[in-house]
């Protein structure tokens, strides 16, 4: 029932429509009718009554709150913070609140700041109303409420109206038999239990907690070493220096000067797809970053492959359909992780980090600028800084080209520039035909990168080519892959991995400044760490570089295994800190906090590296 009752004026009903969201409220239609009654009562009280030639009453109900607050402040009317009055008597300078109650004998004033004008459903008024209202006003109100009560009785809405005016309206909720059956269908226990009151006090059963004497070791997986599975290359990334110019001029120079020959072909990336790269290089050199399809693109981007698999599965399927299951192969820690950590923190010639300087307003801003400048000096010329810049440009350009041309091939060159303006060509990402709808949908990619060293065990899915440019030999890797939209967006902000090492560096420097009562930005103290099962020392600068390399590898290898590992390792790290402080750590009986961590060590090489680092540290503290 949503129609207007006959006893309510159409103008009042229309005005009430926008006052509240009646549809979502319990007994929303009845609540709307009751509020219309209160507004009508305000109008009947105010009806043509004057005082000194002006209206005696001001109706505040359903007016804009800011207007009410302005009028009340002007007339010095006090009211509760969230409960504005409904009516104001200019003759008596008194504010009123109009109330409807089910029983006048049980009514008590809601506030001492302004007066209540209370009426019941029969139209009877509280005794105090006779002192402030005229007989004609009371008679009009009684006649209106009698018509309202007649509508309530005829529509059998007495209970709903009483609950609404008493503020006790409750949503009636029940679970139907059909829904109850659906809930219980796949369970062995009642989803909706039957509450029972036991006559006796329930027995409390519990087992003693056990003290953790030593920290548990994590399992190190056995199996083949994990290969490089990140989107782009890491420490093996290299670039070709090109003459200064635009991206088109740099690609044109590369295309005209290069000679390509296959060295190693992988099963997942046939050598024939090199034609896709050369076609895109030629098209880009001619000023067309987007080109039409060629025959080799069908293999490189898996065009129509999904439809072929569906048709093949449908034609050969028999029996009941089941969800596909994919076994996750367990892999061990590869040796290249440690090699990446060493190579990524090696020195380079150029500075790869350029940040816009912030304005200095206070002395703290000046200290912060000095810390940032020193931090950039420490990490700006490392290999990892150059690789971060490469990933940033590649992911940003590829992400920006999603949805621009779904049916053709888009070339996204990875080009940086040195301070002298020379172009540095790292490679190219080819974005294939795609129809990405959700953030988790994958887009097909063909990635070509200049690499420094090829290892088949590390890059089994890469095909490697010899690239000769102006008599110089380079290695060119080619990989067919796909990547989701949300990960491309994440990697377009990969410069954020610089934040955590900067925070660690500033914390050490400022702690030394607090101890010595003076700031020294050149401080480079020795840091004691447990590495490879022994306590070793390294300088602060070396430590910050190592943290940056680890942050970068954790970022590019972030997946559910990494997130679960880090989340569950917090408990073990808290236990270690407590034991180092000579505090006792207790566990529930039979608890094994390392089990949840071990579940996350599967085939992520960086997770395996972190697990090995945990095992190399002491597990007993006395």
Curated annotation (Swiss-Prot):
GO terms for cellular component: host cell nucleus; virion component. GO terms for molecular function: RNA binding. The keyword Amino-acid biosynthesis does not apply. The keyword Metal-binding does not apply. Pfam families: Flu_PA. InterPro entries: PA/PA-X, PA/PA-X_sf. One of its GO terms (biological process) is viral RNA genome replication. Keywords: Host nucleus, Virion. It comes from the Viruses. It is found in: Virion; Host nucleus. RNA polymerase is composed of three subunits: PA, PB1 and PB2. Belongs to the influenza viruses PA family. subunit of the RNA-dependent RNA polymerase which is responsible for replication and transcription of virus RNA segments. The transcription of viral mRNAs occurs by a unique mechanism called cap-snatching. 5' methylated caps of cellular mRNAs are cleaved after 10-13 nucleotides by PA. In turn, these short capped RNAs are used as primers by PB1 for transcription of viral mRNAs. During virus replication, PB1 initiates RNA synthesis and copy vRNA into complementary RNA (cRNA) which in turn serves as a template for the production of more vRNAs. This is Polymerase acidic protein. The lineage of its organism: Viruses, Riboviria, Orthornavirae, Negarnaviricota, Polyploviricotina.
């Amino acid at each position: 029932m949503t129609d207007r009752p006959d006893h309510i004026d159409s103008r009042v009903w229309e005005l009430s429509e926008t006052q509240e969201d009646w549809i979502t409220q319990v007994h929303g239609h009845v609540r709307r009718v009751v509020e219309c009654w209160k507004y009508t009562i305000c109008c009947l009280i105010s009806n043509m009554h004057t005082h000194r030639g002006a209206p005696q009453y001001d109706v505040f109900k359903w007016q804009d709150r800011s207007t009410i607050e302005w009028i009340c402040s002007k007339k010095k009317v006090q009211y509760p913070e969230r409960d504005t009055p409904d009516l104001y008597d200019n003759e008596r300078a008194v504010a009123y609140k109009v109330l409807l109650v089910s029983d006048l004998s049980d009514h008590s004033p809601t506030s001492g700041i302004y007066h209540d004008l209370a009426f019941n459903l029969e139209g009877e008024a509280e005794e105090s109303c006779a002192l402030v209202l005229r007989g004609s006003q009371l008679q009009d109100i009684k006649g209106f409420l009698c018509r309202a009560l007649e509508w309530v009785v005829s529509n059998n809405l007495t209970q709903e109206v009483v609950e609404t005016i008493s503020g006790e309206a409750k949503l009636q909720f029940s679970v139907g038999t059909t829904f109850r059956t659906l809930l219980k269908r796949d369970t062995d226990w009642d989803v909706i239990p039957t509450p029972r009151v036991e006559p006796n006090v329930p027995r409390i059963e519990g087992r003693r907690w056990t003290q953790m004497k030593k920290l548990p070791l994590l399992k190190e997986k056995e199996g083949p070493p994990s290969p490089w599975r990140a989107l782009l290359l890491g420490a093996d990334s290299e670039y070709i220096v090109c003459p200064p110019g635009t991206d088109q001029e740099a690609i044109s120079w590369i295309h005209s000067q290069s000679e390509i020959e296959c060295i190693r072909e992988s099963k997942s990336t046939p050598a024939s797809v090199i034609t896709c790269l050369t076609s895109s290089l030629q098209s880009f050199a001619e000023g067309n970053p987007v080109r039409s399809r060629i025959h080799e693109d069908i293999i490189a981007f898996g065009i129509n492959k999904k439809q072929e698999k569906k048709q093949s599965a449908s034609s050969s399927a028999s029996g009941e359909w089941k969800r596909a299951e994919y076994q996750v192969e367990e892999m061990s820690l590869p040796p290249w992780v440690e090699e990446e950590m060493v190579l990524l923190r090696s020195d380079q010639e150029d500075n790869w980090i350029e940040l816009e300087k912030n304005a200095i307003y206070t002395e703290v801003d000046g200290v912060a600028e000095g810390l940032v400048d020193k931090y950039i000096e420490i990490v700006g010329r490392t290999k990892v800084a150059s690789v971060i810049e490469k990933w940033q440009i590649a992911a940003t350009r590829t992400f920006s080209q999603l949805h621009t041309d779904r049916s053709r091939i888009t070339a996204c060159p990875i080009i940086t520039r040195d301070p002298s303006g020379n172009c540095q060509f790292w490679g190219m990402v080819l974005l294939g035909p795609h129809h990405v709808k959700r953030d988790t949908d994958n887009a097909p990619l063909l990635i070509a990168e200049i690499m420094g060293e090829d290892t088949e065990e590390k890059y089994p899915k890469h095909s490697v080519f010899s690239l000769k440019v102006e008599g110089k030999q380079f290695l060119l890797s080619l990989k067919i892959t796909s990547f989701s939209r949300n990960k491309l967006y994440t990697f377009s902000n990969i410069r954020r991995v610089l934040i955590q090492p900067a925070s660690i560096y500033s914390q050490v420097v400022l702690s030394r400044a607090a101890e010595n009562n003076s700031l020294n930005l050149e401080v480079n103290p020795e840091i004691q760490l447990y590495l490879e099962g022994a306590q070793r020392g390294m300088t602060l600068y070396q430590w910050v570089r190592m943290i940056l390399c680890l942050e970068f590898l954790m970022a590019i290898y972030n997946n559910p295994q990494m997130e679960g590992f880090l989340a569950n390792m917090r408990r073990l790290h808290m236990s270690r800190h407590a034991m180092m402080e000579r505090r006792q750590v207790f566990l529930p009986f039979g608890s094994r906090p390392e089990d949840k961590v071990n579940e996350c060590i599967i085939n992520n090489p960086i997770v395996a590296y972190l697990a090995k680092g945990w095992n190399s540290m002491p597990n007993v503290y006395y």
